[in-house]
C-alpha cells in the first residue's frame, strides 16, 4: 500500500484489486444516495455524571468519546481521496457550535487529542475564538458532529451536495 498525508492525517492507499470490499464499494459508490442512517437511543447517564464531575461541556466530551470509539473501528476510517480509497490512521473532528450572540452556528474543526481533558480544552478555545461561520470546505479526514440538545428525535437527514468523494460519518444527537 502507498502512504500519504492529507491535512495532517496519515493514510494508506487501498489496492482495490485485493480489497475484500471492492465489489461493495463499486456498487454503492454509483448509487444516487449511497449513505444510510442508523438511529438508536443511548443511555449516557454514567458518562454525564463523569463529565459533570470534571466540569466539561457535555457536547465537547461526547464528541471526544464518539471519535475515540470510531477511530478504533477500521471501517469508519475509510475515505475517498482523489478518486481512490484510502484508510486513515486516525480521524479528526468537525462540529457545529452555536454562537449565542448571533444565534448562528459555525463549523469548528478540532484535531483529535490523546485525552478527553486536552480535547475538551482545545475544542472550547477553538470554538470560542473562531470568528468565521465556515472556515472552508469540510475535509475528508473528519467525523462530522451536530448536537441539538434542546430537542429529542429519532431520525435526522442532512443536505446532500452530491459529492461522491465525501464519505465521512455524521453523528447527531439531541
Model-derived regions, located:
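Helical lid/core segments from catalytic subdomains that handle acyl or acyl-like groups
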Residues: 99-158
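Flexible, Gly/Pro-enriched loop and linker segments at secondary-structure and domain junctions
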Residues: 6-39, 59, 145-146, 153-174
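Residues forming anionic-ligand binding surfaces in small-molecule and nucleic-acid pockets
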Residues: 39-41, 45
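Small-residue-rich loop/turn and linker elements
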Residues: 76-108, 144
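N-terminal amphipathic/basic-hydrophobic helices that include classical n-h-c signal peptides
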Residues: 1-5
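Acyl activation and transfer enzymes in specialized metabolism, enriched
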Residues: 47-73
Amino acid at each position: 500500500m502507498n502512504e500519504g498525508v492529507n491535512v495532517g492525517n496519515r493514510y494508506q492507499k487501498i489496492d482495490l484489486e485485493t480489497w475484500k470490499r471492492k465489489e461493495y464499494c463499486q456498487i454503492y459508490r454509483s448509487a444516487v444516495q449511497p449513505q444510510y442512517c442508523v438511529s438508536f437511543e443511548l443511555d449516557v447517564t454514567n458518562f454525564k455524571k463523569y463529565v459533570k464531575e470534571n466540569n466539561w461541556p457535555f457536547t465537547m466530551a461526547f464528541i471526544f468519546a464518539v471519535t475515540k470509539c470510531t477511530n478504533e473501528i477500521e471501517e469508519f476510517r475509510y475515505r475517498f481521496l482523489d478518486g481512490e480509497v484510502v484508510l486513515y490512521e486516525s480521524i479528526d473532528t468537525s462540529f457545529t457550535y452555536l454562537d449565542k450572540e448571533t444565534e448562528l452556528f459555525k463549523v469548528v474543526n478540532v484535531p483529535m487529542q490523546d485525552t478527553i481533558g486536552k480535547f475538551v480544552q482545545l475544542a472550547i478555545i477553538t470554538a470560542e475564538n473562531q470568528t468565521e461561520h465556515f472556515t472552508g470546505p469540510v475535509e475528508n479526514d473528519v467525523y462530522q458532529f451536530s448536537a441539538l440538545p434542546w430537542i429529542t428525535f429519532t431520525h435526522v437527514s442532512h443536505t446532500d451536495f452530491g459529492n461522491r468523494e465525501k464519505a465521512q460519518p455524521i453523528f447527531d444527537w439531541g
